[in-house]
Every structure is written in C-alpha cells, then in structure tokens.
C-alpha cells in the first residue's frame, strides 16, 4: 500500500498489483522509499480523464534518470488491468519502454488506454481527493499542490 498525502492534508491510498506489474511496482516503491515524489505536484489535470504527477520538473518532461519496461499488452506483457476510475498507471512517451517516474490516476474510465499503458494498482481510499484535484481550474501552467508519497505500513 502506498499513501499520497497532499499539501492540504488530503490522502490517497493506493494498492499496488505486484502480480500483474512487478517491474512497475518495484520501480514505484523504490522511488517512494527514496522520497523522490515528496514535494512534487500533479502537473497535468484533465477533468473526466486523469490526473498526472511524478515529474521532478513539474512540466511532464522529467524523470528519475532511467526507464523501465512497459508492462502492457501492446508491449508483449499480459496485463489485464483496465483503465477504470481509480486505477494508477505509468505515463510514458511514444516509446513503450520509456516510463520512469510519472504516473496518472484515472478520474474516469478510459478503455482506449487498456493494453497501451502499464496499469499497476488502484486507489482504495481517497477518490474524493482525486475528484477535488480534477475539479481545480487549470491551464497549461497550473500546479495543483505539493504531495508527499510514502509507503503505508
């Protein structure tokens, strides 16, 4: 279980699915343990679709300095997780093996992403916080608030 604590005290608890996406989960847990995500923002918010975070630059262009294999069907990995409301998945470029630290949480269902991105867990508490973030008025430069991400005991 991983907990994201927002600057305003809002909490999002995420259960990771290590059986389906072991590489992705291991990478995510490593970044959490190192404190990589602490103080970062949800830099991309698209209401009715998803909220995205995990970029150290806050622009959508940064990462941890390495990439991992994309664990999804179009990349030869059996990953039956669907991109439904509350699912967490890895963001990437057009390169299927370009995921590093950026992730997104589904605000609404997006079946067109199934098999194309590495879903690796689901929000088990705190969808009200995701809804609140998704409701914030945004433009290309808005930052949503700092978050601290840590493993929950």
Task: Cite the ranges covered by each PLM segment.
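Cyclophilin-like peptidyl-prolyl cis-trans isomerases
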Residues: 1-150
